[in-house]
Design a protein with these regions (language model features):
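Active-site neighborhood of glycoside hydrolase catalytic domains
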Residues: 199-221, 228-328
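Aromatic/acidic polysaccharide-binding cleft in carbohydrate-active enzymes
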Residues: 317-396, 412-415
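Conserved, mostly hydrophobic/aromatic
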Residues: 77, 111, 171, 222, ...
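Carbohydrate-binding surface patches
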Residues: 402, 413-452, 463
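Boundary at the C-terminal end of the N-terminal hydrophobic targeting segment
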Residues: 21-23
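N-terminal catalytic cores of secreted or lumenal carbohydrate-active enzymes
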Residues: 37-219, 250
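C-terminal beta-strand-rich structural cap/linker in extracellular carbohydrate-active enzymes
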Residues: 461-471
């Protein structure tokens, strides 16, 4: 009798162990619209046989790793002149260390993995500057006075610290304007690059990338011009039509090759509403061979433009490189940013970057341009000690950047649009699966995740965002 009992217990233990193995675990991280629960780790889910616990009346999200799409570079924002200054100069060492870890550390933070860095001043800068400023009316075609010393004060130290915390960060650089003396009216504000300055500007960009890399910041991508269809009025910017951009790339591409730079060139870097711009550049055989793909912004048009360009040029990549949050946005701000991430990724983006990673209580410092933008981190300098607040953008991006690693691959997942559950899924190189789900409805939604013939049951509260991870 005792022997039979022992055999029964042993068999029961084996069955329990087998059951546990069959019930694959899913980690769950959730953020509510009011941020009362932010990247909160919920109870784990378990996959089990579909017939065992599947209700026919719930939505099913199918995840299929056999259907594979683009490789992922990362998720992040920009350490602008203003952002870097706030982080480096306006926080105590203890506070700065905490913020940097919460931004970039894969264990303690959200592991920001993509940085788009202005080359020279943008609108989110404390002053207007380039790396080759000259007195009005003077030129320096040999770039004798070239220097990135301005950036060594606080921008480069912050980028280097970010790279130490997360070496997987992809860095992109973008000029808002050439030095004023290279332009049609000798100013960084508005105007165009002169054709007779192509050689000098090419050398300037080569020197900029080389200087950054010598300073310890590898540059993976460079876009030729920020928002080339917008002629700025009160901050650095440059009008550059597609006809001029493709002509300039014919200079820049060979110069990068001659200098031994493996930095990839991106075209356009502006809104969805003019896909014909990158299509013109990519249709030029001389320019296109030097261009890795197209950078997009979100401030006009529709995300479907990314798919349009991909359909015409499937061999070229796509990047969402700027989409700021700001006071103009209303309602569920968490959902606004989550929709950007999900929809950009479902339309072939290899990255999603917002704008200034840190701003103050006045949405600056700035010298023109956006004075209503929102950062991942808002630093209130009107109180002592300065108060740090993490915004909806921080948490929305964190739902991707913390779990989707560099070189992950987007895989297929069911999606139900802005009236239901929006989803996007990835497989990391270690084999782990990441599913991001946004509940666009104002009510809790029961659903099931189906993976390799098994089902995990889940519920997501109205307006909330969740990330599900399993292996």
């Amino acid at each position: 009798m005792r022997k039979a009992t022992l055999l029964f217990l042993a068999a029961s233990s084996l069955l329990l162990a087998a059951s546990h193995l069959l019930a694959q675990e899913v980690e769950v991280y959730r953020t509510t619209p009011d941020l009362k629960e932010a990247l909160h780790r919920d109870a784990r889910l378990h996959f089990s046989a579909a017939t065992a616990n599947h209700r026919s009346d719930v939505v099913v999200i199918d995840v299929d790793a056999q259907e594979r799409f683009q490789s992922i570079d990362g998720f992040g924002a920009s350490l602008t002149d203003s952002s870097a200054w706030l982080l480096q100069e306006q926080l105590s060492s203890v506070a700065r260390q905490e913020v940097m870890h919460k931004l970039f550390d894969p264990q303690k933070g959200i592991a920001v993995s993509f940085l788009r860095q202005p080359l020279g001043a943008s609108d989110l800068a404390r002053n207007h500057y380039s790396y080759e400023d000259m007195p009005q009316g003077q030129r320096d075609t040999d770039l004798v006075h070239f220097s990135i010393q301005h950036d060594e004060a606080y921008i480069l130290p912050v980028i280097r610290e970010a790279l130490q915390l997360n070496p997987a960060i992809s860095v992109m650089v973008t000029p808002w304007s050439p030095p004023g003396w290279m332009k049609t009216h000798d100013s960084m504000i508005g105007g165009q690059l002169r054709d007779d300055a192509f050689a000098a500007y090419t050398a300037y960009l080569v020197k900029s990338v080389e200087a950054y890399q010598k300073a310890g910041v590898p540059v993976k991508y460079l876009s030729v011009q920020n928002e080339p269809l917008y002629e700025t009025k009160n901050y650095p910017g440059t009008l550059m039509q597609a006809s001029q951009q493709k002509k300039f790339i014919r200079y820049l591409g060979p110069a990068f090759e001659k200098a031994g730079l493996d930095t990839k060139i991106l075209a356009y870097d502006h809104n969805w509403d003019h896909p014909e711009y990158p299509e013109e550049v990519l249709s030029d055989p001389e320019a296109s061979r030097f261009v890795a793909g197209t950078a997009f912004h979100c401030y006009g048009g529709d995300v479907a433009a990314q798919n349009e360009v991909h359909t015409r040029f499937p061999e070229k990549g796509l990047w969402m490189t700027e989409c700021s949050g700001g006071t103009w946005q209303k309602g569920n701000l968490l959902a606004v940013t989550a929709q950007l991430i999900i929809e950009s990724m479902r339309n072939w983006a290899q990255s999603v970057a917002l704008w200034g990673i840190a701003l103050d209580e006045k949405h600056g410092p700035n010298t023109g341009g956006c004075d209503t933008c929102r950062g991942f981190v808002m630093i209130d300098r009107s109180v002592t000690p300065h108060q740090v607040t993490y915004t909806e953008d921080y948490y929305a991006v964190g739902h991707a950047s913390r779990f989707v690693h560099t070189e992950a691959t987007r895989i297929d997942s069911s999606d139900f649009g802005r009236e239901g559950l929006e989803t996007v899924a990835f497989q990391n190189k270690d084999g782990s699966i990441v599913l991001i789900v946004l509940n666009n409805m104002n009510k809790d939604e029961d659903f099931a995740i189906r993976w390799n013939g098994k089902i995990a049951r889940a519920t997501l509260s109205g307006g909330s965002l969740a990330t599900y991870v399993w292996k």
